[in-house]
Amino acid sequence: MTIRVAINGYGRIGRMVLRALYEDQVNGKPRRDIQIVAINAMGDIAINAHLTKYDSAHGRFPADVSVDGDYMVVNGDRIKMFCTRNPAETPWGELGVDLVLECTGKFTSKEKAMIHIEQGAKKVLISAPGEKDVDATIVYGVNQNVLKPNDVVVSNASCTTNCLAPLVKPLLEKIGIESGLMTTIHAFTNDQVLTDVYHNDMRRARSAVTSMIPTKTGAAKAVGLVLPALAGRFDGFAMRVPVINVSVVDLTFAASRATSVDEVNAILKTASEGELKGILGFNTLPLVSIDFNHDPRPSIYDASQTRVSADGKLVKVLAWYDNEWGYSVQMLNAAEALMAVK
């Protein structure tokens, strides 16, 4: 049965979710049984269509995009466009919307996201870490099995948690993890500024394109929501750097027993070819961040960067991720998983 989807918020993730859905077809993959029937996007429809077609990070969208009145048309599919800051003005029920992809970053609690249910949608998937009241937080490939039929508002966690969780799951199961510290070296995002402006966070006040900027991230702690055995064991921070896209997780953890570089690499290679195939990548080539641009996998382990201390108990691992594209593909994966639960 086709999942009828509305996207609320058409910024970086909203647009990439749409593109990822259609690019599957272009790349010869079977089309997902998902139909985007509506988008609530601020601004002019023609400009949003233009931004859908042309993208500075991901290039030209290989699909036909046009505007017909209040509709954006993608490869012949008519998508009703709305422009309102108030979701109470969106007629999801009239449009038969099954699932709202909440991509504004503003409705991250169940209490706020329920406005979509009140408007007639059946479920909501949030493209951000959720507040404590959401029904579940999932990373597809790691813990989507926790979903229950009565889950209504679900968080897809963050792009960084979607990278970290597939990386640590096999290591937790095979070696054990006592504690860990993570740094995400993260591409700048549009909540930063081009030139210095006033901001309550003095580092956030500085230009994103001229400095490396330390800032907070909840991704390390949030991994405990996805893998409860790690609750309270991880912490970390982000270092925003002047690149437009692709980020990398640098994780150092205390292992429960002595291990080696070869064992760590073997565990993650096996996982990447088995239970986490398509979710966890495995790389041995001397690549750099741009080489992972537009990669659909949310986590790509770099086996060449693994380090283990002399006593075998301190381990450092590295995983790349396209923080836009990989995460958007995960939104589609999670959407299918959420709507399949009966």
Spans of features found by a protein language model:
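N-terminal Rossmann-like NAD(P) cofactor-binding subdomain of oxidoreductases
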Residues: M1-A205, S309, N333, V341-K342
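C-terminal active-site/capping subdomain that shapes the small-molecule cofactor and substrate pocket
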Residues: T2, G236, V248, T252-K342
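Short clusters of hydrophobic/aromatic residues that line enzyme substrate/ligand-binding pockets
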Residues: M72, I138-Y140, V153, M212, ...
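Hydrophobic alpha-helical scaffolding
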Residues: A157-S158, M212-P214, A254, Y321
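Acidic, glycine-rich segments within the central catalytic cores of soluble metabolic enzymes
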Residues: E173, I177-I244
